UniProtKB/Swiss-Prot annotation:
The lineage of its organism: Eukaryota, Viridiplantae, Streptophyta, Embryophyta, Tracheophyta. It is found in: Cytoplasm, Cytoskeleton. Its main location: cytoplasm. Binds to actin and affects the structure of the cytoskeleton. At high concentrations, profilin prevents the polymerization of actin, whereas it enhances it at low concentrations. One of its GO terms (molecular function) is actin binding. Belongs to the profilin family. The keyword RNA-binding does not apply. It comes from Plantago lanceolata. Occurs in many kinds of cells as a complex with monomeric actin in a 1:1 ratio. This is Profilin. One of its GO terms (cellular component) is cytoskeleton. Keywords: Actin-binding, Allergen, Cytoplasm, Cytoskeleton.
Amino acid sequence: AILGQDGSVWAQGLHLGGAKYVIAGEPGAVIRLGDYLLDQGL
């Protein structure tokens, strides 16, 4: 995963604009998009 300067986490396999956010190879990763915290289970 790539950690952004604002603390956001971007991982390979992330799909924006859909209902599903998939993190490939990052079992414990959390994605922060704006005010949303999305874990791998969403």
